[in-house]
Each structure stands twice: as structure tokens, then as C-alpha cells.
Amino acid sequence: MNFEEAEDINGIRFAWNALPSTKVEAGKVVVPTGVIYTPLKQREDLPVAVYDPIFCSNQNCKSILNPYCTIDPSGFWRCPLCSYRNPLPAHYQGVTPENLPLELQPGSSTIEYITARPVQNPPIFFLLIDLCQDEDNLAALKETLIVSLSLLPPNALIGLITYGTMVQVHDLGSEKISKSYIFRGDKEYTEKQISDMLNRPTSTPQGQLPQFANSLTRFFLPVEDVEFQLTSILENLGKDPWTVANGDRPLRSTGSALNVAANLLGSTFPGFGARIMLFSAGPGTLSPGLIVGPQLKEPIRSHSDIDKDNAKHFKKAVKFYDSIAAKMVKNAHTVDIFAGCYDQIGMLEMKNLCNLTGGTLLLSDAFTTSIFKQSFLRLFNKDHEGYLLMGFNGTFDVKTSKELKISGLIGHASSMNVKTQNVSENELGIGGTSQYRLCSVSPQHSYAVFFDVVNTQSLPQNAQSYTQFITHYQHASGTYRIRVTTVSNFLTSDEQTLTNSFDQEAAAVLMSRVTLFKSEQDDGADVLRWIDRMLIRLCQKFADYRKDQEESFRLGPQFQLYPQFIYYLRRSQFLQVFNNSPDETAFYRHVLLTEDTNNSLIMIQPTLTSFSLDSEPEAVLLDSVSIKDDKILLLDTFFHILIFHGKTIAQWRKAGYQNQPEYENFKLLLEEPKQEAAELLVDRYPLPRFIDTEEGGSQARFLYSKLNPSITYNSSEFATNNGAIVLTDDVSLQVFMGHLQKLVVSGSS
């Protein structure tokens, strides 16, 4: 069964491609019946219909006409999800198997409808710029923002807020002089207060009282009209003039700026696609939303502080930013957060602003780095027709046939609290609804959807369940579009059929998402114990072994890689937070919850490629035995691309052999991994950090931290020259598998 082919067509990867036929059987398979779905997955041959879809008339269903529907000669179609008989529209009469409309053709399991309903407003971009940063960093940010103006659609609306100790809302409609409104940075304003302050009277006949209209639209003007004015304002921005006392941090009003922006946008364009883009160079030091106090002697919170409840500002800040996130979701607006500093800015506290709205969370050391510049500009990538590859103001509906119910979703979405008949009482992730808000959606965004098998009766052979995913969104071209994917799965009670249908890669990614979801509520050690229990139970169910005989343990090819995926997940930065700041953890987890199966797997278990003079490049084990003196290694962790030169290669490079004509082959060897790394960098978002290092180099630690430590300073192979020695007390994959086998065959859980 080729799972990747199905993903290329429908953007879908099921953990179980055949589903257990009853609720009892589903409870025994351990890995949830779930799917990783990428609604806007790019596809060159995507069927596109320039008309509105036909919906099922059953008010409890409302699914869309699809290739699994049956058409009868009397002019009716039967819905595969609810079995309701619907009359075909008049212009569909005469449909035959040889003359099918586009949506009924077998290749239209995924189809996009361009509806007749026009979008009333173009996309809106609201820039929030932190002025509490050094001149070089600010200059680089301004330069990148000015470049980005040319990438926006000319009719896109744009607004600007700058902030330091005060919050400044810029009136871009004022041509002759630069005009702005100042708000206090230490005050939380209501939507009404902001609206009352910024609305201005419209001209009225003499003798009448002035009437207030919504003149707030003057803060959001078309890029083509204000590009010169906005460029001038950006070029003239300087560092926040407020003096910073010795031993203090700058007084930075991040919370107030976001509060003003969310309320102003909500008063002006509720329910229309809009993005607030925050560019922050440090933590908020003013309430509301204070992350750390102004005095440098107060350290910013660590993971340990949060775990021990010693982070005195943490809960209050989370509550404040979560309230803004709820407001953004209600208005269908998105927040993107870009950090450009070595310090933490409070991403952990602010993460739900992005997680609930589908926004970008980007961590970089400075706005001068290519990681920030290229990643930010890639956000404005366009399709072959020249439209932005971003959807706005979306909703995501999940429809199922009667055998399944929806347990929940894990990904960057929020519940719309629509509890239909196919919503399960057993929640996993964001549950209790069959409809989700996607304030922003792109070809990258992937969602884990989990199902509950509710059927209790045995079913006939070849029984099928049906699932339909419906994504409504505002396209950058100014149209409303509907992407529809309909799939069917066999329901089976045959264990061998289930085994053959298991996609271990999709299963590992689904379990990683469940693990991250649990990590938000439970203690880290409890989460690790839970993963281990699930792995033991899966192996007890599907491995071949004789009780109490470890050497008899065998896993079939469908399950063989799964334990090592879990091993690397346990060791990953997603769960082992010891060496990361809370902001880094929030960033890494955010990206894992965005990406599809293949990219998520690279994050969980990075890829390692070996290059040598006497052989072609080859994929090698992510293991310390793969480090050889005469080889170059290319490591891809998704967040880092690292080229590691073995000891001998590094010595030859230092000696300059590559510059001598007789060693042309050595020069080509040095170039080969660089070319492959460049190919990996082309489409990756966010842009990974590129590292070029060698044996003994300080940055070689990035490679060593990812390798399975099969040879450590205290292992019996310590004295051999069979690979590199890893200075760690971590358990190796071999020891992990040994423990797993022992527990499985003993019947322990």
C-alpha cells in the first residue's frame, strides 16, 4: 500500500488505512484511528470547479456531492455519508457514467470550488514594530519590511503601530505631515475606548450634533496608495527615545500594543481576513502582558521556575494574551510573532495568539539574520497565478458516516463549538465540535483529526466508512473557495488486514501530536511514561513473541521502524526541555504542530547522509558509528542543516588540497553536501540554520546531540575505532529496544 501516493492526491495520511470494525476492536489497537490532513496541499492537477457545490439536503449531514455518491436513473443521488436521497439539480439531469460532472469523476476525491460570492475586503496586514532595539537591528528590520511591501497585493490594506514605552498608532492617510495617536503602554484599553478615541466626527449640516461614523478605516489603507508614505515613515523610525536606567531593561509595552491592535482591527474589519504581524526584540516589561520586571536583577522565567510555580508573572501574562487570542479567533484574525533577539520575548506566554489563529511563530537571534529575512519574505510566496499562498478567515468541517464520530483535532485551529450528531463524547485534542475556525491556512498547515469507531455490531465483509473534509476560506484573489476531500476506508475485524494497513510514519506523527497535547497539561515524566506504555501495548498486540523469551521477539515490516521513531521522539527537544528556554520549546512545538508527515518525521528523527571519495552519497544510521574520519556527513533536523567533516577530511581541507588541480575530486566532494544542503534550503519554512563544522569543532555538538549514542565513554566499545564516542549518559537505541522486548515478552505494561 503506497501511503505517499494517497497523500499526494488528497493530502491525507491515516495511521490505519483500514479501520477496526467495532468500538471494542478499536480500543485494542492502541494507536488512535486518526489522520494527518493538509487541506490546501498543492497539486498541479487539482480539479477546480468555477461554481458553487451541491450539498446534501439532510440538515444533519450537509455533505457535498462527491465521487462516492451513487446516481440513479430517476434523477436522484444518494449521499454515502448519511444514505439520504437527494434530487439532482435540473442542469444535472441526464448524468450518465460516461458523462459525469467534474465533482463526480473518480479523480475528484479532492476538488476546489471557486464560489460566486465575492470577498468584500482585500486581505489586511497590521504591522507592530518594537522600537526598543539597537539601531542596527532596527535598520535591518525596516529594510526587510520595505522590501515586503512590494510582495503584497497592491489592493491589500496595511496599518502600522510602533511601540516602546508608549504605543503609537500611525494615521497613514495624512499625506503632508506624519500623524499618529499615542496610547499609554501600561494600560489595557477596551474596544469601545479605542473606538471612541480614534473615531472622528463626520461633517454634518450646521445646527446638528456631530454623528460618529466608523472612520477607523483610515488606519488601514491600500498598499498602492500609501507605499511612498509608509516607506517614508519606516525609514524615519528611530530607537525608542525613552531613557533606560542603568541596570534596567527598556520599558517595552508589547501587551498594550497587541491589545490596541486587536481592538482596533476588531472594530474595523470583524470577520475579514487580517494578520497582525508583531516584530519584537525583547520581553514585555510593562503590564498588561508583562513577562519580566524592568530591573535586570530579576531573571526571566525558566522551565524550572514554571514547573515549580516560581514564575510570578507567568499565569497573569498567559491569561492576558489568551484573552486577546480569543478576540482574534472571534473576528477571524491571525497573529504572527517574529522574535529578533538573543533574549526571550515571552513566546511561551503568547503562543496561543499564533496556535489558535494559525499564525507564524519565528525565533531568530536578530532581525539582521538571513533566518529572519528570508523566512519572513517566504511568507509572501505566490502561486503560479501570482496570488499569495495564504488563505484567510477559514472554517474546517469534518463529516463522517455513521460508523465514525469525531474525537477532536490537534493543530493550529480553534473550536467553533458546533456539536453535530457525529461528535464523540471521548475527546482527544480540541473536541466537542465538528467545525473549526482556521483564521489562517496555507499549503503547509496540517491538522491531526482523530476518530472514534462507534459501531458495535459486526459488519459485512468489505464494509466501508466515509469521511469528508470541507475547508471554506478566503483566497488571496478576492474569492471565497471551498476545498473538499472525500475518502473511504474499509472496516475490518481481520488483524492481518489491519496490520497491512498500518502507516507507521503517520502513526508516529499522530502520537507525537497527542504527546505534545498531553505535555501542555501533564508533568513531563508522566508524559514519557505514557508514551512508553503505549509502545509496550502496541508491541504486545502486534509483535510475534513467546512469553518470557526475549530472543523470540519479532516486529513485522509495518511496525519495524515505529519503536525507533518513539525513541527519538523521547530524546527530542519537543519533550526534553533541559537545554532549551521556554520560548525555544514553544517555537519548536509550534512548528511540529504545523507540518505534514514527512517534515514532522525529519524533526522527530533527523536524516543523516554520508559523502565519501569512493562511493555515492548514501543515507546512514543516525548513530555515532556513522562518524568516520574519511567521510562528510549532512544532518537535516528541519531546524538545522549541518555539514560535518570527519577528522581526515578536515585536515585535508585545512591543508588546501581542494585548491590544487590534481585533487579536483576532493574539491567536488567538499561541494557535494553544500549543493544538497542548498536544495533543502530552497522551500523550507522557517529557513533552517546552516552550520559548517568538523571533528572537534564547537558546533559539532549539534550533530552529537542527535545521534544514537551506541558508543559512549562508558561502553565496552570505548577503545575501538568503530565510530565516534558520545559523552552522554543517555540510553542508546539498542538498550531501549532491549528493555522494550523484555517488558513486552514478560506481559508487563
Swiss-Prot record:
InterPro entries per the UniProt record, alphabetical: ADF-H/Gelsolin-like_dom_sf, Gelsolin-like_dom, Gelsolin-like_dom_sf, Sec23, Sec23/24_helical_dom, Sec23/24_helical_dom_sf, Sec23/24_trunk_dom, Sec23_24_beta_S
GO CC entries: COPII vesicle coat; endoplasmic reticulum exit site; endoplasmic reticulum membrane; Golgi membrane
> Is Membrane among this UniProt entry's keywords?
yes
Summarize where Zn(2+) binds, as residue positions.
56, 61, 79, 82
Keyword GTP-binding attached:
no
The record's SUPFAM superfamilies line, in alphabetical order, gives: beta-sandwich domain of Sec23/24, C-terminal, gelsolin-like domain of Sec23/24, Helical domain of Sec23/24, vWA-like, Zn-finger domain of Sec23/24
Subcellular location(s) per record = Cytoplasm; Cytoplasmic vesicle, COPII-coated vesicle membrane; Endoplasmic reticulum membrane; Golgi apparatus membrane
How does this protein lie in the membrane?
Peripheral membrane protein
Q: One Pfam family of this protein, by short name? A: Gelsolin
Kindly report the protein's main subcellular placement as a broad class: cytoplasm
Its keywords, alphabetically, are: Cytoplasm, Cytoplasmic vesicle, Endoplasmic reticulum, ER-Golgi transport, Golgi apparatus, Membrane, Metal-binding, Protein transport, Transport, Zinc
Among CDD domains, the record links this protein to:
Sec23_C (cd11287)
A GO term for molecular function: GTPase activator activity
GO BP, one annotated term: reticulophagy
Q: How does it assemble?
A: The COPII coat is composed of at least 5 proteins: the SEC23/24 complex, the SEC13/31 complex, and the protein SAR1.
Q: What does this protein do?
A: Component of the coat protein complex II (COPII) which promotes the formation of transport vesicles from the endoplasmic reticulum (ER). The coat has two main functions, the physical deformation of the endoplasmic reticulum membrane into vesicles and the selection of cargo molecules.
**Record-stated family:** Belongs to the SEC23/SEC24 family. SEC23 subfamily.
**What name does UniProt use for this protein?**
Protein transport protein SEC23
Q: Which organism is it from?
A: Scheffersomyces stipitis (strain ATCC 58785 / CBS 6054 / NBRC 10063 / NRRL Y-11545)
Gene symbol of the encoding locus: SEC23
